[in-house]
């Protein structure tokens, strides 16, 4: 299974081997894990955090099921981290990302 950090970096357009922004990306990923996803009831009850590129999506959600899919969680994580780490300059693009986030929050909370 793929690394959480690596998959989000690639979605953000950051190369896997480029580590300069890792601390900031990790901070934003952990923020999403500790606040939004935990409040939505997704993932371990005690919470989850990463420290490097060793943590995988399988560590966060041990097995994919009908209620929560890895792709839904990954897309949600990407959209949230994108808004915090590298927000779009266009207000219409920001609005689209915010609407996507709301849709995923609704779907993940069911």
Residue ranges and their predicted role:
Residues 65-79:
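Positively charged, aromatic-accented nucleic-acid-binding surfaces
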Residues 1-69, 102-110:
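Conserved short "hinge" loops at termini or chain/domain junctions
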Residues 75, 79-110:
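Protruding loop/beta-arch "assembly-hinge" segments enriched in small, turn-prone residues
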């Amino acid at each position: 299974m793929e690394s959480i950090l690596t998959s989000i970096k690639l979605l953000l357009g950051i190369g896997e081997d480029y580590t300069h922004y890792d601390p900031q990306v990790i901070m934003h990923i952990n923020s999403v894990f500790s606040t939004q996803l935990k409040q939505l009831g997704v993932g371990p009850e005690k919470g989850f955090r990463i420290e490097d590129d060793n943590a995988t999506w399988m560590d966060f959600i041990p097995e994919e099921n009908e209620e929560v899919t890895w792709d839904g969680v990954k897309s949600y994580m990407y959209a949230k981290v994108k808004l915090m780490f590298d927000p779009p300059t266009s207000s219409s693009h920001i609005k689209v990302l915010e609407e996507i986030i709301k849709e995923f929050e609704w779907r993940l909370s069911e």
